Regions:
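Gly/serine-rich nucleotide phosphate-binding loop at the start of the catalytic core
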Residues: 1-79
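Positively charged, helix-rich recognition surfaces that bind polyanionic ligands
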Residues: 6-9, 20, 141, 152-161, ...
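Alpha-helical coiled-coil heptad-repeat segments used for dimerization/assembly
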Residues: 24, 31, 42, 89, ...
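Stable alpha-helical structural segments in soluble proteins, enriched in small hydrophobic residues
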Residues: 36, 83-90, 94, 383-393
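Long, hydrophobic, amphipathic alpha-helical segments used as structural scaffolds
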Residues: 37-44, 91, 95-102, 180, ...
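Acidic carboxylate diad motif detector
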Residues: 55-166, 304, 310, 316, ...
Length: 402
């Protein structure tokens, strides 16, 4: 029987005392993270190039907790191990970038206001989901904090595996991961579709259907700009500045939620209608990378225009569309529904004629128009791209071993 891991996120309703304790828990885990990072930095910079591993730092936890029982000794041992694993993962990524010749970017120290998550690797070890089952109100218990009320708006299916505390502005959330049996697949429809992601239209299907791009970030840009300007004028560490910061956070939170809502609804519509969905294997990070500077050979120290301003506008539009989030949601929904999703190479999908197969840059005279210079076929460029994506996906599916 197939099993999947699904995440649930619920708003917590802590008391005043619990809110203070949750903040102290984040503060102390942040201190542990920074202390462990300092030890690793010192070892890396030492002439001996000593390597500090996770096991060595985890073995020190018992001594650290005994030395500081009021702070480090107050919290779950397992959650502190998870924080050290988090640092270890960042360090491994750093050394991997060093070996590959990329830009290393050493892990940085975290400010207490920039450390917003504490993980509990196992339900029942330092935490307990639904800790008062006899009570109609759902609660989650954390070591050192107590039973915190939870606004459970949906049922949790399966066995809870991990629990995390997350702070967003002044709100507190509990995030669960649960292992559950794959549900029964949706009835087959016999339909297949290819999708072409875009900016003007959020996506275009191989059938010629266009899904509008809501541009949530652009719609909220004026309000965000005004709120951020008001924030910049406030005196630091004042109540007025805190209120202004809360307003900026609320606007960003609203944009993020609307973007997620649109992604969920669009993905659900595709999964319900089609048995097979092909999409472009987009390298979004590469697409939104800043252009390299162009030195001026005639003026040492000067640079020529490299189109950075126009590229920045395109990058904002790509981020606003949220392609990566949408594709992640689409894959998760398809897995639960028993549908098949396949990523294909996007090269030349919008330049290849679906009628005669001729591929040329001249086939696309404008952003929206496709006109084959060989056979004269005309169509919307995004619809042509989606159709070629579908055909490539079907070919790849047929080539896969049974």
């Amino acid at each position: 029987v197939g099993r999947v891991i699904r995440a649930y996120k619920f708003l917590m309703r802590p008391t005043v005392g619990q809110t203070i304790a949750l903040g102290e828990m984040l503060r102390d885990h942040c201190s542990l993270y920074n202390g462990a990072l300092q030890e690793r930095r010192d070892a890396y910079r030492h002439v001996s190039k000593t390597s500090v591993k996770y096991g060595m730092q985890s073995a020190q936890l018992k001594e650290i907790r005994a030395f500081d029982p009021e702070r480090q000794g107050r919290w779950s041992f397992s959650s502190q191990q998870a924080t050290l694993r988090r640092l270890d993962k960042a360090m491994q990524a750093f050394f991997r970038r060093v070996k590959s010749g990329g830009t290393p970017g050493h892990p940085r120290f975290r400010g207490v206001n920039w450390f917003d998550t504490v993980d509990f690797p196992k339900d029942g070890d330092g935490c307990r989901w639904d800790s008062t089952p006899h009570d109609p109100v759902t609660r989650v218990r954390f070591q050192g904090i107590g039973h915190v009320r939870v606004n459970r708006h949906r049922q949790v299916v399966g066995k809870v595996k991990t629990v995390s505390v997350k702070r967003e502005g002044r709100r507190w959330y509990v995030v669960l991961t649960a292992e559950q049996v794959l549900p029964h697949p949706l009835p087959a429809t016999g339909s297949v579709v290819g999708i072409d992601m875009g900016i003007v239209s959020f996506l275009t299907t191989s059938g010629g259907e266009h899904v509008a791009n809501p541009r949530h970030g652009r719609a909220a840009a004026a309000k965000l700009e005004a709120a951020q300007q008001a924030l910049s004028r406030c005196q630091r560490r004042s109540n007025r500045r805190q209120k202004a910061a809360d307003k900026v956070a609320a606007l960003h939170r609203g944009v993020r939620r609307r973007r997620l809502d649109h992604a969920h609804k669009t993905a659900l519509g595709l999964v319900r209608k089609h048995d097979f969905i092909a999409h472009e294997d987009l390298k979004i990070r590469n697409m939104s990378a800043a252009p390299a500077p162009k030195p001026d050979p005639g003026k040492p120290g000067a640079f020529l225009s490299n189109g950075a301003a126009a590229k920045a506008a395109l990058n904002r539009s790509i981020a606003d569309a949220g392609w990566g989030v949408f594709l992640t949601i689409l894959n998760a929904k398809a897995e639960s529904a028993g549908r098949e999703v396949m990523a294909v190479d996007p090269r030349n999908t919008s330049r290849r004629c679906p009628e005669c197969g001729h591929t040329a840059k001249e086939n696309r005279p404008t952003q929206e128009t496709f006109r084959c210079v060989s056979c004269g076929h005309q169509a919307h460029a995004d619809a042509v791209g989606a159709l070629n994506v579908l055909r490539a996906g079907l070919v790849r599916r047929e080539a896969q071993p049974a």
